[in-house]
Amino acid sequence: MHNLFTEASTHAGLARTVEQIGQPRFWRQLILLLQQWLAFDNALAMVYPRAGLPRALEIFDARGEGNPEAMALYLSGLYQLDPFYQACQERIGDGLHRLEEVAPDQFRQSEYYLKYFHDHVLEDEVQFIVQLGESGALSLSLGRRERFDSASHGLLAVVCPWVVALMAQHWLQLSLCPAPATGMAHQVRDAMSLFGAKVLSERELEIARLILRGYSSKAMAERLAISPETIKVHRRHLYAKLDISSQPELFSLFLQSLGHDPQDP
């Protein structure tokens, strides 16, 4: 691993980032600083309120392509299938977290991964997370077209303490001097809580949500403290009530509940 603090450009980039604490360009500067040491394809800074809707603070694409429609779909309710969002809501500790740490056992076989994550977040993801007490959590996501290897994780672990400290200090400065709304907040309904509520029982709703997030029957049984056979019975019943027979159809219904046509991505 190279010495992170030997090159003049490193010192200059870090200084520029510190200068932007509490300012609009903070996130972009922090992302550019991280790119000096590690290649990644996209980055996303988010705030996830404990109660309320998430807000995108910075969207970065290394190729300059971007996809506003994909971001709009995520913010309209798809974020509720994001394992990092769930981890933030469950108050995972501050620091660097890998996808494998937070994702359900069959996440890479889920429709969310196959139809959204793999196309827009790409192959792998890590996040720096800062808990904001009762108000929510702050995250900085880095996405990559190939897996982050052990050397990459090691490098990110080295810089993690001061990255997290900068994020926390930036948010503190904003809370002391609130910035005007950016217009990026989306007023949307809680699609996950409404999805299927008219026809499914509370237990069936719970299982439908876990299916969408990528949990296997075994993992669902462990999480809910019931048998895998009971899970399978509930799955059959909820599929019958929704007149579907597969996870792809369940995912399509969820997209429709967000106002998105799955036939027109």
Predicted features along the sequence, with ranges:
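Regulatory input/activation interfaces that engage signals or partners
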Residues: 2-150, 161, 171
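Signal-transmission/dimerization alpha-helices at domain junctions
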Residues: 155-176, 217
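A cross-family signal for key residues in well-ordered alpha-helices
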Residues: 157, 209, 222, 240, ...
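Recognition helix of helix-turn-helix DNA-binding domains
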Residues: 214-249
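Residue cluster at the C-terminal edge of the helix-turn-helix DNA-binding motif
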Residues: 240-245, 253, 257-261
